[in-house]
Amino acid sequence: MYRWDSIADVSTHRGIKHQDYKGKRVHIEISDDFDNVLSLKMDIGVHKDLDIEQEEYCFDVCFQEDSASVLINSCEQMITEKLKSLIRFGTRSTRYKDVFDICYLSDLADMEKLRFCIQKYIYADTTIDVNDSDEIRRRAERIFNSSTYKKQVERSKKNWLDLSVEEVLKKDLEFLYRI
């Protein structure tokens, strides 16, 4: 179990600026009594768009009577953000962890909410020329069938799932056919 008092290092790396929000990237290193260490980065920002429902997570702060709550993006919003980046940059994308995140999140996604997010953040975005789910699938297939892209994903060591890269890309494509 990780405790708040076991956070070894918290540092603000840099400001981030996306179209939909501005914020800070925070690097956190958490360790436990067994010398297990978890390093992660967290983007903290404020969205301009209040139409999308955020999920509230509450953390018990051991040394205070109060708790801390944060609002996080829904898995549908996370998938949409990752898809949008993949579509925008294609095989040039260096966000290799995203294909594994999409694979994991695909089991949790509500398809109606996902379609709403895709409509709002991908189809309505005039900076990328994507108007339907067929185009999303075509682009994803082109990217995932690229031997160069597959090799880069393999070498990235961003695979946090107990699946091969081939299995993950196949599952991601199957998921995209359900949109």
For the regions a language model picked out, list residue spans one by one.
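Structured mid-to-C-terminal alpha-helical surface segments
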Residues: M1-I179
